């Protein structure tokens, strides 16, 4: 880990000064340095609200962070916030420091603390595609709110889906061709689901589920993943409405092409009901764009409307 001594001078009365040389080969050495600094220096905040613990966490200095956190824990300041509302835990998460995240949680950091945007440690991991941070939260064994909402009304799972949509190219029809960034974000989706995130939760602004968000982004890989989840009533899930529109309505309104066709077929196979109408009294078939491209889907949706219910399950 970190190497070399930490030169310590008398504790200043002003903001914390990050040492020119940091500790140390072991936790014991780091503890000795923190003892020499004293609580006044460790509790001090700079002009941006950062403590030394925030700085250690951001730089991945595990033993220094652990030793500093032990001191702040004694003074019940382990969740001290910098100017953007980030606790040391949130800083460690954003810096992709899973070991420090797990250490802070084990020392008693508030797992559901949120910054000034309402983002928890799960939201941060989901936003940046950091499966290691999610694994650290899971390994810590702490109870964390998987349905916490940020100030946009999004759960961590909604956030992970949106982040994955951004990272995936329209041509990414198969997980085998995903970029490293997209793969990490897909792993976050998998992990949140495994941790128990509710895939039927609707975001607050427009009532979209993660399925609506995946369809809206023309992401057939993600649509298929969500439709293969083992728990819950699949037919009810696939027919949930967002401001009157089912996922099938949204799929029908997509630009024509292979992604649209794959999504429509996935939805129909999962029990999507093409007879449902939105607030404008439209069925999905009415939302297909004109032209020869969608004609096959037009016929498919019309046939599905008269097929026995058992054939679409």
Swiss-Prot record:
Pfam families referenced in this protein's UniProt entry, alphabetically: Ank_2 (PF12796), Ank_5 (PF13857)
Q: Which cysteines are joined by disulfide bonds?
A: none
Keywords recorded for this protein, A-Z? ANK repeat, Inflammatory response, Nucleus, Repeat
Q: Which GO terms describe its biological process?
A: inflammatory response; positive regulation of T-helper 17 cell differentiation; regulation of gene expression; T cell receptor signaling pathway
The UniProt entry, under SMART domains, shows: ANK (SM00248)
Show the SUPFAM superfamilies listed in the entry: Ankyrin repeat
Start and end residues of the ANK repeats are: 48-83, 84-113, 117-146, 152-201, 206-236, 243-276
> Main location per UniProt?
nucleus
- Record's GO cellular component terms: nucleus
- Where does the protein end up? Nucleus
The family database entries (PROSITE patterns) matched by this protein are listed as: ANK_REP_REGION (PS50297), ANK_REPEAT (PS50088)
The superkingdom of the source organism is: Eukaryota
Per the record's keyword annotation, is Repeat included, yes or no?
Answer: yes
Is Repeat there in the keyword field? yes
- Please give the subunit comment from the record: Interacts with NFKB1, RELA and RELB; in the nucleus.
Protein purpose: Regulates the expression of IL-2, IL-6, and other cytokines through regulation on NF-kappa-B activity. Functions in the regulation of inflammatory responses. Involved in the induction of T helper 17 cells (Th17) differentiation upon recognition of antigen by T cell antigen receptor (TCR). May also regulate TCR-induced negative selection of thymocytes.
Q: Which family does it belong to?
A: Belongs to the NF-kappa-B inhibitor family.
Task: Name the PANTHER family on file.
Answer: ANKYRIN REPEAT FAMILY A, NF-KAPPA-B INHIBITOR DELTA
Q: What is this protein called?
A: NF-kappa-B inhibitor delta
Q: Which organism is it from?
A: Homo sapiens
Q: Give the taxonomic lineage as stored in the record.
A: Eukaryota, Metazoa, Chordata, Craniata, Vertebrata
Report the gene name.
Answer: NFKBID
